[in-house]
Each structure stands twice: as C-alpha cells, then as structure tokens.
Amino acid sequence: MAAGSWTCLILAIALLCLPWLQEGSAFPTIPLSWLFNTAVFRAHHLHKLAFDTYPKLEEAYIPKEQKYSFLRNPQTSLCFSESIPTPSNKEETQQKSNLELLHISLLLIQSWLEPVQFLRSVFANHLVHTNSNFDIYLYLKKLEEGIQTLMERLEDGSPRTGQIFKETYSKYDTNSHNDDTLLKNYRLLYCFRKDMNKVETFLRTVRCRAVEGSCGF
C-alpha cells in the first residue's frame, strides 16, 4: 500500500475513534454514598486513633494529680478550636443544615492542619496503627478535600455559610509556652480527640439525611 494510502487509513481510524476516546476520558460521577462513607471512615479512624492513644499517653507519663488539675482547670482544658461555634448537643446538631454541618466540620479539620504535626511523634510512639507509613497530616488533608467535595455536591444554590472567625494555633501556643512538651502534647491530644468526635458525629448526621439507608451504618 502506498504511503499516501496508509496516511489516509490512519487518519480515518483516528477520526472514527475520537468520539469513543472523548467519552472514555470523562470520569464517571462518584456516588454520593461513596464520598460520605469515605469521609465518615476517615473521621472515625482519626477519632479512634486519638481515643486509643490518649489513655496510653496518660498512663505512661501523666501523674494522676496533674491529670485531675488539668481537667478541673477551665484554662488548661480549653481547646483552641473552641472559637469555632459548634452544636453542643443532638438537638442543636439537628437544627443545623447539611451545609452548615459540613462547613463546621471543614473548619475543625482545617484548624488542626498546623498543630497535628506536633502530635506525629505521639502517635508514632504509642502504636495504634500497623501501617508505619501512615501520615496523619496527609490523612487530615484527604478528609478536608473530601468534605469540600461533599459541600460542592450538596450545594443547591443557597448562600454558603460565611467564614467563621477562629483563633490560630499560634496564639494558643503562645499562651501555653510555659508548658513542657509532654503536657502540651497531652492537651493537644485531649482536644484532638474531642474535635474528631465532633467531626465524625456531624458527618454521620449529614450522611443519614442525604443517603438513603445509611442511618446507623
């Protein structure tokens, strides 16, 4: 076959295949249920990680007297994320819209992107996961991205919840500069456990509303 004929044949095949290639290049829409299940799983994993690590750190290094004084003192038990208004009970949670709960969850996750790096050594020393390559910061980033995707999918044209003012960790860290590293990590872990529990609760609530048959799962 002449060179010109080969060129025409190749061009014809390419043109015939073009619509198929274009169709195949488009990613199918990810099911909403999968997005929710992934986000809930990640939030649960982070909460469980903190829940399992906290008593081990406490038992190994924190004297009982120091523990009780810490819990009774509103200054030391106050978390830097308290500046983010969150529902304090089930009734208040149910009064929030899906987008509001997702936005609050997003703010809580974002507030931890800086301080969680101080907890890496705590989690590494106190076990819990068998994957030595686990990176808690990257895991938080994945959860942040997942929540942002859910917000985009649930956006119905209603105005987004405005940015809520929150104190930075740097301000909190300055106020606690007299604490030794161990006590500071203890306080951080205490707050991280509380906040991840909130995020998991809020995500489960929204999933229950948005995905049929997912309540209690």
UniProtKB/Swiss-Prot annotation:
The modification Phosphoserine is found at S132, S176. Residues 1-26 form the signal peptide. It is found in: Secreted. InterPro entries: 4_helix_cytokine-like_core, Somatotropin, Somatotropin/Prolactin, Somatotropin_CS. GO terms for cellular component: extracellular space. Pfam families: Hormone_1. SUPFAM superfamilies: 4-helical cytokines (SSF47266). Coiled coil: none annotated. Keywords: Disulfide bond, Hormone, Phosphoprotein, Secreted, Signal. GO terms for molecular function: growth factor activity; growth hormone receptor binding; hormone activity. PROSITE patterns: SOMATOTROPIN_1, SOMATOTROPIN_2. The keyword Secreted applies. Disulfide bonds join C79-C191, C208-C215. Expressed in the placenta. GO terms for biological process: animal organ development; growth hormone receptor signaling pathway; positive regulation of receptor signaling pathway via JAK-STAT; response to nutrient levels. Belongs to the somatotropin/prolactin family. Plays an important role in growth control. Its major role in stimulating body growth is to stimulate the liver and other tissues to secrete IGF1. It stimulates both the differentiation and proliferation of myoblasts. It also stimulates amino acid uptake and protein synthesis in muscle and other tissues. This is Growth hormone variant. It comes from Macaca mulatta.
